[in-house]
A protein has these predicted regions:
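Hydrophobic alpha-helical segments
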Residues: 1-182
């Protein structure tokens, strides 16, 4: 159960908040998950929505990379909602079911393909030590270049922000398959 009242109807908001609610509904198809808490601050919700739109739909990174990164970040941050939501998104983006199981089980980077392991290591170092080693930095930099590395870092930050919101307020509206629950 959520720790604060969740905003599920636009009528619960003042006029400016209703516009943000509508924009979220239009861009995402539904107003759920972190938006149920973020809408207590419509301006924050709107700015978060814009960042998320760039990360998810406009980034120069391959969609599969974005969804895999989101999935690893959600799992490493033990964020039930983002994990559940992105299992489906990752599958649709082409992340293999076995890879999703490895992320779910928090298996070592060596159990992933080389390209997956690079992202797993990068996300885990950022989330757990708040820094990346020189070798991880160089690997990611060599693969994605400056712009791509900035976008990958921002993707991790975006999903960390959502995880903080969801985990703080206990907002969970998505459910993963039974064998992938966290």
């Amino acid at each position: 159960m959520a720790r604060i009242a969740t905003i599920t109807k636009k009528e619960e908001l003042a006029a400016d908040g209703q516009k943000v609610f509508d924009a979220i509904a239009q861009s995402r198809g539904v107003v759920g998950g972190p938006w149920l808490a973020l809408l207590h601050s419509p301006e924050m919700a709107q700015r978060t929505m814009h960042l998320g739109s760039y990360v998810r739909f406009e980034s120069t990174l391959d969609h599969k990379v974005i969804e895999f990164t989101a999935l690893v970040a959600a799992r490493e941050l033990d964020c039930k909602h983002e994990w559940a939501a992105h299992v489906n998104h990752a599958q649709k983006a082409g992340v293999p079911a076995e890879t999703i199981r490895l992320v779910h089980q928090k298996k070592g980077a060596e159990t992933f393909s080389s390209e997956e392991a690079q992202i797993v290591s990068f996300v885990r170092e950022m989330v757990h030590t708040h820094r990346v080693s020189e070798s991880t930095f160089q690997t990611i930099f060599n693969r994605f270049g400056e712009k791509g590395m900035v976008e990958l870092t921002a993707t991790i930050g975006y999903y960390a922000m959502l995880a903080c919101t969801l985990n703080t307020f206990d907002v969970y509206t998505a459910t993963p398959p039974d064998d992938l629950k966290i």
